[in-house]
C-alpha cells in the first residue's frame, strides 16, 4: 500500500479517520491545549511493526477508536528539532484512510486533551498544519470517489 523506498529520517504513521454524517463527512481531530495544536492522530513505529500496524495502534491509543484501514492516502514531510549540535532532522509521516469500527473517544490516552469529530468544511480552519489539511482533503476526495464508484 505504501512506497517501498527507504527514508533516511524519522518515520511515523497515522490516520485520516472519517465518518459519514448525513450528507457531509467528519474527520477525527486530536487537540492539545499546551502547546496548543489540532492534529491528526499519528505516532512512531514499535520495533517490528509495519506502518499499517503503527497507524492503527496509534489511532486507537490517541483517539480510543478501533479502526479499519481502507487505503493509503500519502505522506507529509517536515523537519523536527533534535536538539544538540545536530539541529533538525527530516521526518516523514505516512497517512492511511480509516473508518471507525468500534471504541469510543472516552478511551483515548492522555497525549491529547480533546478528541472530536470535525466537519469536512471546517477542517481547513481547525487543523494547525496546512500539510495535514492537504492530506485530509486528499483522503476525503478518495472517499467521495469510492461513494461514486469511480477508481
Please give the residue ranges for each predicted region.
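Charged phosphate-binding loop/patch that engages nucleotide di/tri-phosphates or the phosphate backbone
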Residues: 125-151
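Short, solvent-exposed loop/turn segments that connect beta-strands within catalytic domains
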Residues: 20-26, 84-88
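A conserved beta-turn-beta hairpin within the catalytic core of GNAT-like acetyltransferases
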Residues: 34-36, 107
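A short gly/proline-enriched turn/hairpin at secondary-structure junctions
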Residues: 39-42
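Short, acidic/hydrophobic/Gly-rich beta-strand patch recurrent on exposed beta strands
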Residues: 28-32
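Unchanged
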Residues: 45-134
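Acidic, metal-coordinating catalytic segment for phosphate/diphosphate chemistry
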Residues: 1-22
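Conserved beta-strand and immediately adjacent loop positions that scaffold enzyme active sites
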Residues: 14, 26, 114
Amino acid at each position: 500500500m505504501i512506497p517501498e523506498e527507504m527514508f533516511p529520517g524519522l518515520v511515523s504513521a497515522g490516520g485520516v479517520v472519517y465518518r459519514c454524517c448525513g450528507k457531509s463527512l467528519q474527520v477525527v481531530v486530536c487537540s492539545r491545549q499546551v502547546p496548543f495544536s489540532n492534529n491528526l492522530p499519528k505516532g512512531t513505529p514499535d520495533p517490528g511493526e509495519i506502518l499499517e500496524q503503527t497507524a492503527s495502534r496509534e489511532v486507537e491509543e490517541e483517539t480510543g477508536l478501533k479502526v479499519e484501514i481502507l487505503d493509503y492516502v500519502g505522506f507529509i514531510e517536515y523537519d523536527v528539532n533534535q536538539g544538540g549540535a545536530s539541529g533538525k532532522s527530516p521526518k516523514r509521516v505516512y497517512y492511511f484512510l480509516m473508518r471507525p469500527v468500534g471504541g469510543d473517544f472516552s478511551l483515548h490516552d492522555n497525549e491529547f486533551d480533546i478528541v472530536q469529530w470535525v466537519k469536512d468544511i471546517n477542517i481547513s480552519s481547525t487543523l494547525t498544519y496546512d500539510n495535514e489539511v492537504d492530506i485530509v482533503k486528499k483522503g476525503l476526495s478518495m472517499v467521495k470517489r469510492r461513494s461514486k464508484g469511480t477508481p
